Structures are given as C-alpha cells and as structure tokens.
UniProtKB/Swiss-Prot annotation:
It comes from Haemophilus ducreyi (strain 35000HP / ATCC 700724). GTP binds at residues 19-26, 66-70, 128-131. The gene is era. Belongs to the TRAFAC class TrmE-Era-EngA-EngB-Septin-like GTPase superfamily. Era GTPase family. It is a peripheral membrane protein. Residues 45-49 are annotated as: G2. Residues 158-160 are annotated as: G5. Residues 11-179 form the Era-type G domain. Residues 128-131 are annotated as: G4. This is GTPase Era. Residues 19-26 are annotated as: G1. InterPro entries: G_ERA_dom (IPR030388), GTP-bd (IPR006073), GTPase_Era-like (IPR005662), KH_dom-like_a/b (IPR015946), KH_dom_type_2 (IPR004044), KH_sf_prok-type (IPR009019), P-loop_NTPase (IPR027417), Small_GTP-bd (IPR005225). An essential GTPase that binds both GDP and GTP, with rapid nucleotide exchange. Plays a role in 16S rRNA processing and 30S ribosomal subunit biogenesis and possibly also in cell cycle regulation and energy metabolism.
Amino acid sequence: MRMIEQAPKTYCGFIAIVGRPNVGKSTLLNKILGQKISITSRKAQTTRHRIVGIQTEEQYQAIYVDTPGLHIEEKRAINRLMNRAASSAIGDVDLIIFVVEGTKWTDDDEMVLNKLRTAKAPVVLAINKVDNIKEKDELLPHITALSQKFDFAEILPISAQRGKNVHILQKIVRKSLREGVHHFPEEYVTDRSQRFMASEIIREKLMRFTGEELPYSVTVEIEQFKLNERGTYEINGLILVEREGQKKMVIGAKGQKIKTIGIEARADMERLFDNKVHLELWVKVKAGWADDERALRSLGYMDE
C-alpha cells in the first residue's frame, strides 16, 4: 500500500510595529527583512503609509505592518489620517511590537501605550537604541518601571541599527504565528508596487538631503513609470511642496540639491529593481495639500 506523504505544516501571521515617531520602527523592519522596504530618516514622521514587509523562512511567514508614528498632534488632515492608519493596524494582528527609545519615555509613548490597552494581541516592548544609552545602569530600573505600566508579553532591549537582539525578537515573532497557509509567495518581501517604492525612495532622499530645512508638507507623485524598449525604467517624479520658498530649498543653489537627490534616488532604485533607471524630477507648489483630504486621497494617503 502506497503511503500518502503529508505536506509539512505552515505558519503565518500579522505583526504590527507601533510607536511614537522617530524611535526606529522603519529601521527595525528593514533590519528584519534584510533590505530597505520602509524609508528611514533622522526626521520624525517619515513613514506615512502602512507598508507591509514579508519575511518567509521555510514553513514560517511573518507579515509586518509598519505604521506611521502615532502622535498627539491632530490639527492637520495628514496627521489625522496617519493616526487613523496606525490605529487600524493594531486592530487585527497576531503580535504587536511596541518600539520605544532607550531610557526616554514621553507623553507620546504614554498615548501609544493607552491605545494598546484595548488591543487583543500580545504586546512585546522593544527598547531600541540601547547602544546609545550613556548611563548603562539606568536601563534595568527603566525596564522595571515599564514592566509595571503594562502586562507586556516580553521586554527586549535591542539596537535595530546594529542588529543587537533582533534575532531574539524574530524568534518571539515566529512563536506567535498561527498554523495556516502563507498569504504571499516566498520570494515576496513587500506587497507594494515598484511605482510606490520609487516614490518612497525619492521622499527618503528629500528628507535626508534637506536636513531640518524642509517640514513634512512635501510629498512625491510618480507621473510616469514604464519600461522602455531598451529595457530601462523611465520614471518621472513630481515633488509637491506647499510654498515657493520650499521649492527653492528642494532645488538648491544652481539646482545642485535636486540633482543630488535624483542621483542618490536612482542608485537606490537600480539596486532595489535590479534594473537600469532613468529618473527625472520636477518640483511644483501645491498650497494646502496636507490639509486637503481630497488631495490626500488622490496621493494615496487614504483608502477610497
């Protein structure tokens, strides 16, 4: 009698990465995935979309939701939408990774924690940037104090930048996955389109090369993304700002700043897409776009 070979069990689950702005959530996701999916910058509020990162190892598939940083300020339409996206991300997941920064604890951290009190999924507290803590003896009392604030499933000091204890965090994630079929093919690392990733790369370079000069009233719209007959991606990016002065900041003296942004963005795109890229960038003033929900919808900041 011929024996029927049973397929090995597979496991899959959704993990939300939450925290106030600029604590290293995007850096952590990129470190876990081994490549850049979510954009990073020294500035807060760099992540605006719920980017999904996918890690498949043998029978395990972890699907990561990288949220915008939850924050208190909600005066602008874009901030309200970012808070809404982050809050909805924690509603239906198998595990929540709450990222905080070293021994700092702010009102925004407290606000995020209060939102997590209604979450059904277990919460792992990841204390990031521990390599930057000057007084190392402050860490243990800080962990003790935080453990009294909430019933965390685990508390783990990490350094997303250096990779410290990230492998332990991944083991915790693996234990949280449920038995079930994988949602994505194993070669997928994100569900976002190349067009979307191109806009994110340009936006990262904007954040990186404008320093503290440019506020967050800047976005990128990809007007053309096509593969030409020579096998090169032709990408046209439109950078939207709110004021004429911001346009001058992006362009820079004799166009040098936008040239640098374009060179760096093209290099990242060619690495990510494994293909030659011809990139052209323009800057346009569109006053009030960050306060206009219709404009935000057309730019992909909210679902139709």
